[in-house]
Amino acid sequence: VATVDCSGYPKPACTMEYMPLCGSDNKTYGNKCNFCNAVVDSNGTLTLSHFGEC
């Protein structure tokens, strides 16, 4: 199972670095920062499906 350590999030701004992750909502997130901010917003219901685009 793929996991991402989201401790230290949310962050107020994310870089434009493109290292895509696919969330359990079947949405592609551009990088770990964008994904982890969304995880925090979802109150932990969003998880990582896999690395790379959905």
Swiss-Prot record:
Keyword Transferase: no
Positions annotated as glycosylated: 43
Record's keyword terms, sorted: Disulfide bond, Glycoprotein, Protease inhibitor, Repeat, Secreted, Serine protease inhibitor
Presence of keyword Cell cycle: no
Residue ranges of every copy of the Kazal-like domain listed in the record: 4-54
Disulfide bonds: 6-36, 14-33, 22-54
Marked site (Reactive bond 3) residue numbers: 16-17
Domain of life: Eukaryota
Any Pfam family the entry gives: Kazal_1
GO CC, alphabetical: extracellular region
Alphabetized GO MF terms: serine-type endopeptidase inhibitor activity
Compartments, record wording: Secreted
PANTHER family in the record: OVOMUCOID-LIKE-RELATED (PTHR47729:SF1), SERINE PEPTIDASE INHIBITOR, KAZAL TYPE 2, TANDEM DUPLICATE 1-RELATED (PTHR47729)
Domains (record comment): Avian ovomucoid consists of three homologous, tandem Kazal family inhibitory domains.
Protein name per the record: Ovomucoid
